[in-house]
A protein has these predicted regions:
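Membrane-interface alpha helices of multi-pass inner-membrane proteins
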Residues: 186-201, 212, 232-237
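Transmembrane-helix signature of polytopic, membrane-embedded enzymes
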Residues: 41, 120-143, 162
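Specific aromatic-rich, kink-prone transmembrane helix
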Residues: 75, 119, 159-178, 190, ...
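Extracytoplasmic catalytic/substrate-binding loops of multi-pass membrane glycan-assembly enzymes
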Residues: 58-70, 79-91, 99-104, 319
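Transmembrane-helix motifs of polytopic, lipid-linked glycan transferases
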Residues: 107-128, 166
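Membrane-proximal stem/loop segments at transmembrane-domain junctions that anchor or position
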Residues: 250-328
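Start-transfer (signal-anchor) and selected internal transmembrane alpha helices
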Residues: 1-53
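Aromatic- and kink-enriched transmembrane "portal" helix at the membrane-lumen/periplasm boundary
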Residues: 1, 59, 86-89, 98-102, ...
């Protein structure tokens, strides 16, 4: 109830803030200027400089458990899977082929982020957004310690965030121009960005679909320019998840079932660990069929919703369960 109340209050505050901002007007040009290389280079350079200082200070960066899992795939210890987006794993593998050091992956990641910051500043400058607004946004994106910290890890979340930042700037450009900026080259670029957003996180497809729907709803008169971008996004996504993944022998995610019922299974595991007497015989029989109670006690972390996912490969998939068997 407390968390729900906080979430509701935060949502209400956001909605009220958005409503209040309706009266705030920015002077936007009727037509965009030519790309502003000076603004792009200054913003990207500043972001890259800040990131370089952080990387040197915390050299060679950090690895999360997700990244360790991906590196084991790259090293051949385990087969490539799409548990963590395989495209991101393949990108890391390609970079490590060039320079076999994790800091190189982080350096490229920081460069990509700096380019996204520079592109965002360039879009705002081309539409003559006030300089102080561009300065504040660039400073926030470059100096925010939370962003600097997470960018020191080669997480899929970082790659996804970079793609989303590019997408946000592209959508602003489309919005300000009412779709007129969608040249063939920019349609290709927008489609590629939408595809990357859909692939680099398993739930990123929701954002890509929402962005595509917004484009069609907000600019129905420009559907002839929008549809090619959406078609490119679909074809690119299918091409990567299909032929490309097949060429590299990417195993389809075997734990999609686990993703579906991981939360209720975690709740049951917590109860089975802490208060098994409160479960009825049918539930106990099901849990014992998956694994003996000693396994739950050994591996369970009370309140950790990720627990079932992390141990799925070694514990919970010794039997070929289906959704009907689980829920039936």
């Amino acid at each position: 109830p407390v968390c729900a109340g906080i979430a509701f209050a935060a949502l209400a505050a956001l909605l009220l803030g958005a409503k209040a901002c309706r009266t705030v007007k920015l002077d936007v040009a009727e037509r965009a200027d030519r790309p502003n290389r000076r603004v792009f280079l200054l913003a990207a350079g500043f972001s890259a400089l800040v990131y370089a200082v952080c990387l040197v200070a915390y050299f060679p960066g950090g690895f999360s458990s997700d990244t360790v899992y991906q590196c084991r795939q790259i090293q051949g210890v385990m087969p490539y899977t799409d548990w963590h987006p395989a495209l991101h794993t393949l990108m890391m593998a390609a970079l490590l082929k060039l320079v076999d050091h994790p800091a190189f992956v982080l350096a490229v990641q920081g460069l990509c982020y700096a380019l996204a910051v520079g592109y965002t500043a360039d879009v705002l400058a081309r539409w003559r957004i006030p300089k102080w607004v561009i300065l504040v946004i660039t400073a926030y994106l470059s100096l925010n310690p939370s962003i600097s910290n997470i960018m020191l890890f080669p997480w899929k979340d970082c790659a996804f965030a970079i793609a989303v930042l590019f997408l946000g700037a592209q959508l602003l450009d489309v919005h300000f121009s009412q779709g007129e900026s969608l040249s063939p080259a920019r349609c290709l670029s927008l489609g590629a960005t939408l595809s990357l957003c859909a692939i680099l996180r398993h739930n990123g497809v929701a954002m890509a679909l929402a962005a595509g729907a917004w484009l069609l709803i907000a600019l129905p008169q420009r559907w002839k320019r929008i549809l090619p971008a959406l078609l490119i996004a679909v074809l690119m996504t299918l091409g990567i998840r299909g032929p490309l993944y097949q060429a590299f022998g990417i195993e389809r995610q075997r734990t999609q079932l686990d993703e579906t019922f991981g939360v209720p299974m975690t709740i049951l595991a917590n109860i089975y660990d802490q208060a098994p007497e409160s479960l009825d015989d049918e539930i106990v029989e099901f849990l014992e069929d998956v694994a003996p109670r000693s396994v739950y006690v050994e591996h369970n972390s009370v309140g950790d919703w990720n627990d079932i996912k992390w141990y799925a490969g070694t514990i919970y998939f010794n039997k070929p369960y289906t959704l009907l068997q689980v829920y039936g």
